[in-house]
């Protein structure tokens, strides 16, 4: 929604510039985790005469105690959670990419296995666990669920989201992947793989974690083309593999629970049981001497931006 801040404001919905880091309100999330919302923060939110929209792809990682803290501190506002429900088989690939963007180093298979080993306890695989928690904290009527896969199939995600927050859709609204000037577009899996490798290098050698690598990679992409980025991309592209995801047992289990327990708050439900193909980079590229050389050159360039 960052691209649409002025258009939202015209209809009375504030998307604050406060707490913005990269593409969302990540600083607000961190303040919630640290129990560090100041009197000024609370006053800004509590005393606003307009509705306020906060968004961060990482709010989902907060636990019940975190949300209870937010509810108790922001005591002059009715907090409504808008949750985009994606079937686990499709979602895990996207969530893994977000983990990498924020400093993760796990391969997709490693990340997926940690959840798949205990599917009934994973809030990533069993969406009902997270949703029940939201209703417990904020109330049953303060949850709106958007069927992401339904919206995606109709190319209506932004429209459906705006409907959920009572905003009238206009063609002037920015849709990220259709606009060359939009922020927070999805990244090619090849670049995700390069960032994953860089995350490991900078965490081990420079104690640099979080989204710093992704931020610098995006900012310096043009310059990195002169340091072997194109050549490294080509090496990784040559070793991509395709796997099918979706229509898993855990998807069927979650689907049944969702349509029985949350039918009244799902905005645009449509059954989803198709199988999709995703691409993954094999880690074998790291054994390629040429790839190692290009990665070292890219690392050297990014190292120049480390604080002294």
State each model region's role:
Residues 1-308:
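Anion-recognition interface
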